[in-house]
Amino acid sequence: PEATEAPADDTPVGYEVGMKCPDFTAPLYGEEGGEFTLSAQKGKVTVINFWATWCTPCVAELPYFAELYAEYGDEIALVAIHSNLVTDDVDKFLAKENLDMPFALDKTGAVIKSLGGSTQLPMTVIVDADGKIVYNKVGSVTLTVLEGLVAPLLAE
C-alpha cells in the first residue's frame, strides 16, 4: 500500500470556541529577549489572561492564575499578558505583588486583537493541547472555574 499524506488540519483559525487559536508571540516581562509563543506550547493546555494594572477585576483575579500555575505549572503553559502601552505601572505593581507566574506585554494591542479582544478586560482564553480554543471569556473568573476547565483537559 502507498503511503498517503495525513489530511491537513482544516479547523478554522479564529478566537471562537472550537477554532484553532491564532499563533502569537509576546515579550516576557522581566526576561531580556524572552518570548512567549503560543505555537511553542503545542501539546500543552495553555491558559492566557489579558489584564491591566488599572483594571480592578483583573488585579483581583491574578492570584487565581498564580494558584493555578502553582498547582499545574508542570503540566500547563500559562501567561498573563498586560494589555497596555505603558509599563512603568507594571514595574511598580509586580514589585509589590508576589505572583509567581509568567507575565508578558502586549505593547501594541496586537495580541489581544488577534484573539478577538477589545478594550474590555479581563479576558481569559484557554487552548487545548491541540491548539483549539475551549474557553474564551471577557470578565472575571475564579480559581474554581479555572480548575474546572483545566483539570478535565489534562485528563484527556
Go through each PLM region and give its residues:
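N-terminal targeting signals for export/organelle localization
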Residues: P1-D23, E156
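Hydrophobic beta-strand core positions in alpha/beta domains
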Residues: V47-N49, Y69, A80, V125-I126
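Structural microenvironment flanking redox-active thiols in thiol-disulfide oxidoreductases
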Residues: V59-E97, K107-S114
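Thiol/disulfide oxidoreductase modules built on the thioredoxin-like
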Residues: K92-D100, L105-L154
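A short beta-strand-turn-helix
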Residues: Y15-E16, F24-T46
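Loop/turn elements at helix/coil->beta-strand transitions in domains of secreted/extracellular proteins
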Residues: G43-T46, G73-A77, L99-M101, A129
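Short active-site neighborhood of thiol/selenol oxidoreductases, capturing the structured segment around
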Residues: E35-V59, L78
